[in-house]
C-alpha cells in the first residue's frame, strides 16, 4: 500500500508540473503563433533596421558591439544575428512541449534536425537588403555545435546564401565557446565593423555576466545602453522563454516547477 501511495504521488506531481507548464506557456505560444500583433511587431523591427542601415553604414565612427572599442572604422561592415526566435521561428517546438507535456531540451535536437523552421516575419527582407549593400551576415547562436549542419541547411532552404570565406554560423561549443556570446562577437570584430545586432535575449547584446543577473540589474544595464536600441541594437519579442524568465527565479533551474510558479506570482506588481 505504501509503495502504491508513493507511486501515485509521483504521478500526481508529474501531472501537476505538466499542468503548470501548460498554464505558463500556452498564451505566449498562441501569441507568437497566431496573433497579428506579433507579426506586425516583428515586421516593424526589421523594417526599422532596413531604414536605419544606410545611415549606420555611412557613419564609420560607430560600432554596435561593446567589445569593439577602437580601430574599426576602415573594416568592412557586418551584422550579427541570433538564430532562434530572431531569424528562425521555432514556436512549433514550444507547441509540441505543451501538447506532449514535456520540457526543454526534450525533443529540441530532433526539432532542429527536421530543418523546417520558418523565417521570423521581416528578417528575409532585412538579410536580402543588407547583402545587397555589401554587409556580411553572421549568426551567433547558442544552438550546440552538433546542430550546425541542420541549422545551415534550414537557412539555405529558406534562401540564405553563405558567401563569406569564413564561418558565418558560430555555434555554442563549436570551439571553446560557452553560452556567453562576447567571445564570438569579439571574433567577428577582429575583421569587421559590427554595425547592427539582433536578438531576442539581452545576452545577444551584452556580456553574459550582466545578462545572467537579477531583473533589476538587467533593467539597469538595458537603460545604460538606451542610445543603442532602435539604432544599432534590435530586440525581437520572445514571451516564451529567455533569461528574463530565468532572472525571476534567480537562475535556480532545479527549483521545483510549483515553486517557480509561486515565485513568478509573487513577482507580479499590482501597484
Residue ranges and their predicted role:
Residues 17-81, 250-271:
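Non-catalytic pre-domain segments flanking phosphatase-related domains
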Residues 47, 148-271:
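C-terminal cap/substrate-recognition subdomain and adjoining C-terminal extension
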Residues 109-138, 145-146:
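Short, acidic loop-to-helix structural element flanking the phosphoryl-transfer center
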Residues 54, 58, 93, 128-136, ...:
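Sec-exported extracytoplasmic/periplasmic mature domains
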Residues 1-26:
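Bacterial Sec-dependent N-terminal signal peptides
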Residues 57-69, 137-142, 164-167:
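Surface-exposed patches in mature extracellular/periplasmic domains of secreted proteins
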Residues 76, 87-118, 132:
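Active-site neighborhood of HAD-like aspartate-dependent phosphohydrolases
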Amino acid at each position: 500500500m505504501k509503495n502504491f501511495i508513493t507511486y501515485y504521488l509521483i504521478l500526481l506531481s508529474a501531472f501537476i508540473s505538466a499542468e503548470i507548464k501548460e498554464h505558463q506557456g500556452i498564451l505566449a505560444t498562441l501569441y507568437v503563433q497566431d496573433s497579428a500583433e506579433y507579426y506586425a511587431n516583428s515586421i516593424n523591427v526589421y523594417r526599422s533596421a532596413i531604414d536605419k542601415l544606410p545611415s549606420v553604414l555611412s557613419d564609420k565612427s560607430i560600432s554596435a558591439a561593446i567589445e569593439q572599442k577602437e580601430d574599426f572604422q576602415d573594416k568592412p561592415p557586418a551584422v550579427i544575428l541570433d538564430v532562434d526566435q530572431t531569424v528562425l521561428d521555432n514556436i512549433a517546438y514550444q507547441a509540441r512541449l505543451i501538447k506532449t507535456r514535456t520540457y526543454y531540451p526534450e525533443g529540441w535536437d530532433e526539432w532542429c534536425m527536421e530543418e523546417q523552421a520558418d523565417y521570423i516575419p521581416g528578417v528575409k527582407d532585412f538579410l536580402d537588403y543588407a547583402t545587397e549593400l555589401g554587409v556580411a551576415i553572421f549568426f551567433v547562436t547558442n544552438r550546440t555545435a552538433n546542430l550546425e549542419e541542420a541549422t545551415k541547411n534550414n537557412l539555405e532552404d529558406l534562401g540564405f546564401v553563405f558567401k563569406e570565406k569564413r564561418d558565418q554560423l558560430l555555434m555554442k561549443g563549436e570551439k571553446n565557446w560557452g553560452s556567453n556570446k562576447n567571445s564570438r562577437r569579439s571574433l567577428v570584430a577582429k575583421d569587421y565593423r559590427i554595425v547592427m545586432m539582433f536578438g531576442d535575449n539581452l545576452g545577444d547584446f551584452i556580456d553574459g555576466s550582466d545578462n545572467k543577473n537579477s531583473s533589476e540589474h538587467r533593467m539597469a544595464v538595458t537603460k545604460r545602453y538606451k542610445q543603442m536600441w532602435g539604432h544599432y541594437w534590435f530586440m525581437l519579442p520572445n514571451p516564451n522563454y529567455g533569461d528574463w524568465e530565468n532572472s525571476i527565479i534567480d537562475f535556480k533551474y532545479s527549483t521545483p516547477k510549483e515553486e517557480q510558479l509561486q515565485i513568478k506570482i509573487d513577482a507580479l506588481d499590482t501597484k
